[in-house]
Design a protein with these regions (language model features):
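Fe(II)/2-oxoglutarate oxygenase catalytic core
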Residues: 1-194, 198-203
């Protein structure tokens, strides 16, 4: 059973088998990686103050050694959480984003405070390169999730933190209210953190 992380995020601990996590990591490494961008369009911008991390876009239908796809392994768990707790009307699933955070002596890789949700529906410009454009157009991102593919002994830092839905102070871009940090079991390999896309969070 999933357990609440405070009141805005839910975790499922170790639901993806370690060997499947390692396979997904290898697929990510074999896929072209670029610096993650910010902004709501296909022509986003690189802003390393806000976001410095590697990003690759994964084929959700890529077959793994057990004959199932990445999509098959992850989305049933997320759907169950949504059906039991959040109850969003979900109409489509976006492309998987494989993100890496590497140690940099000058500036550690990170993704500072942000929310995934759009305040306006997706436009044709934003969807033009998406094969699922007809499903995505004029919709909103409602539910987000983060899958921890790495074993906790293999890295330091990388803490998932979030604040309440009131979000950030627009002057300081920092939370006015309490900040929460995911507990250790959310860092276990194969764990998933599920949260509404309007929740501000950082890594």
């Amino acid at each position: 059973m999933p357990s609440f992380l405070q009141e805005h995020c839910l975790q499922l601990s170790r639901v993806i088998p370690p060997n499947i996590c390692e396979e997904i990591i290898q697929i990510g490494k074999d896929t072209y990686t670029e610096y993650g961008q910010i902004g709501g369009s296909e022509e986003g911008i690189e802003d390393h103050y806000t976001r410095k991390s590697g990003v690759a876009w994964l084929d959700r239908d890529a077959k793994l050694s057990d004959g199932l796809t990445i999509f098959d392994h992850i989305t049933p768990h997320v759907r169950q959480v949504n059906e039991e707790f959040f109850k969003f009307d979900l109409s489509f699933h976006e492309t998987y984003q494989f993100t890496t955070y590497k140690y940099d002596p000058d500036r550690k890789e990170h993704y500072s405070w942000h929310c995934d949700g759009h305040h306006t529906p997706y436009t044709e410009e934003e969807c033009k390169n998406d094969p699922l454009i007809n499903e995505r157009l004029n919709t909103y991102r409602k539910l987000s999730y983060s899958v921890n593919l790495s074993h906790p002994d293999e890295y330091e830092g990388g803490h998932f933190e979030w604040t309440d839905p009131f979000g950030l102070n627009p002057q300081t871009m920092t939370p006015d209210n309490i900040t929460y940090r995911a507990e250790q079991k959310a860092r276990e390999q194969g764990s998933i953190i599920v949260f509404p896309s309007f929740v501000y969070h950082q890594v």
